[in-house]
């Protein structure tokens, strides 16, 4: 799943920017490869490209990242992304289907703008609970514009799928809190840098909420990361006995 790969990318990013006195070249290469492969699954995941660019904000990763511009890994990944864009263009006349502003209507094989816009509205309508196998709202364009979908989205989608997902995450947090309860209060000073990453994550969440607020369209991993990154940073500050942790981790895996 692309969402799992994005979660791995975020974890790897946190590792890269917080581990000192290490050569991050191989890890940054791995991060680029993961994101590149994710994009090949769905071009929608191009939105995660800024995650790589964040490396330019950190002194210890900036030079390593810039040096990768001349590496085979970077150019292979760039070529693969370019191939995906060209493939979409050849099939639809759009660089990023169904974004109308990336489409060329005057090409012989191009899909007309009206059809492309209808597809875009339908995708957005479905993701905002405005359509189902046995239901479609009457005024589609009005429904997907601004926040007109909120009341119906909460009624039709939030209180059965999103609420269940949030309760599942809450249960997992409670289980982890019980597992590590003996370590609470035993804090160790550790500087963990993640503020830029979390700002980017919030931007991703806002884009998801306003354009396609369905868990299956990028919501699962964004909600999960927004909750568990701060919790993981807090756990990182605790003085944890890792031998005891290993035993508890095995028990936790069997329980879940």
Where are these regions (language model features)?
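Membrane-interfacial loop-to-transmembrane alpha-helix junctions, especially the N-terminal start
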Residues: 24-28, 73, 186-200, 217, ...
């Amino acid at each position: 799943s692309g969402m799992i790969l994005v979660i791995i990318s975020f974890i790897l990013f946190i590792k890269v920017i917080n581990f000192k006195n290490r050569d991050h070249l191989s890890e940054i290469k791995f991060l680029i490869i993961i994101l590149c492969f994710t994009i090949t699954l769905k071009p929608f995941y191009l939105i995660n490209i800024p995650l790589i660019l964040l490396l330019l904000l950190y002194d210890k990763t900036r030079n390593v990242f810039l040096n990768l511009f001349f590496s085979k890994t970077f150019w292979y990944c760039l070529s693969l992304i370019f191939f995906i864009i060209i493939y979409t263009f050849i099939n639809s006349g759009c660089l990023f289907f169904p974004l109308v502003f990336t489409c060329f209507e005057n090409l012989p094989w191009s899909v007309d703008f009206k059809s492309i816009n209808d597809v875009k509205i339908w995708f957005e309508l479905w993701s905002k609970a405005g359509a189902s196998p046995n239901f479609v709202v009457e005024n589609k364009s009005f429904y997907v514009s601004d926040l007109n979908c909120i009341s119906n989205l909460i009624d039709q989608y939030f209180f059965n799928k999103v609420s269940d997902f949030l309760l599942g995450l809450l249960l997992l947090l409670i289980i982890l809190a019980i597992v590590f309860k003996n370590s609470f209060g035993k804090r160790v000073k550790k500087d963990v840098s993640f503020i830029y990453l979390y700002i980017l994550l919030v931007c991703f969440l806002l884009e998801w909420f306003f354009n396609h607020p369905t868990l299956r369209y990028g919501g699962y991993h964004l909600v999960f990361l927004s909750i568990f990154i701060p919790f993981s940073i807090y756990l990182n500050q605790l003085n944890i006995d890792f031998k005891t942790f290993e035993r508890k981790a095995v028990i936790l895996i069997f329980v879940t």
